[in-house]
Amino acid sequence: MSVTTGVVDLRSDTVTRPTPEMRRAMADADVGDDVYGEDPTVNALEETFAARVGKDRAIFVPSGTMGNQLALRLLTRPGDVVVAGARQHVVIYENGAAARNAGVQFHAVDDDDGTIDPAAVADAVDTAAHHHPRPGLVCLEDTHMPANGSPWPIERLRAVGAAAAAAALPVHLDGARLFNAEVASGTAAAERAAGATTVMCCLSKGLCAPVGSLLAGPAAVMERARDERQRLGGGMRQAGVIAAAGLVALRTMVERLADDHGRARRLADAVTERWPGAGLDPAAVRTNVVTWAHPDPSALVAHLRAEGVLAGTIAPGVMRFVTHHDVDDAGIERAVKALASAP
């Protein structure tokens, strides 16, 4: 449980607090004006991340949503359609930003298992021949949050990447929890992002940084990224103060994600024991997200809150737990106990 509040907060991994090492790094950060490209700590973070995901360059942005929207602006033109899974963050959790900011719409395809069929790319191209909008981009999400944070099988990632390449379409990888996928699969982030033109990753989820995400891609694309970031209001000044925490996150917080994954599996077992018909297979919980069906989420949320456990929903009738650095084994057992007596 949180050593700060005494509450077991499983609503999201965005509630994590910066570690003591991050706070020290933030206090001591060497800074400059990042809009001029003169913040050495931001520059170091961007270079570190780009190397980690196998791309030429990266840019630091305030949020994952901005990173995704920036990719859409860089890789599409107004009027395009983006081929994406129907439950992906960029499709349903960004307040319609794609239409507003990039002038695009989605060709949403089935992603119930957390992936999309490579054939969906060719289907979208074929559909466009019949007076439909032109496909301009394929967007993927790894891990796929609504599908219990499932990491894509690497063979499937490669197959979709190959299908996009055959159709001459760029690929954007929403890797908000990319390093959870790396740890769970044993496949390096750079390999997982190899078929993507651009890749975004959040530092402020399981990696515990207080704020910030990164978008990386080829030099030819990223040359325009600063201008597009400015149009979205994302230019920051002495951002090294927060970038310093991101450097610590990439250095110290990735391997320990395995602890979060094990704790999520413990919760999944408890949920299945309490509600065998909830549609949750504990074996499908490979990272830090647990989702299940419940007939009265508001009653369950209230019960858990009364027991000192915070949970949330992601859709009508769908509950969610997300494990993270700030919830330890004792916190998990408290949640398990609360579940046993839940309505």
Residue ranges of predicted features:
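Conserved PLP-enzyme active-site core in the AAT-like
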Residues: 2-29, 33-294, 298-307, 311-327, ...
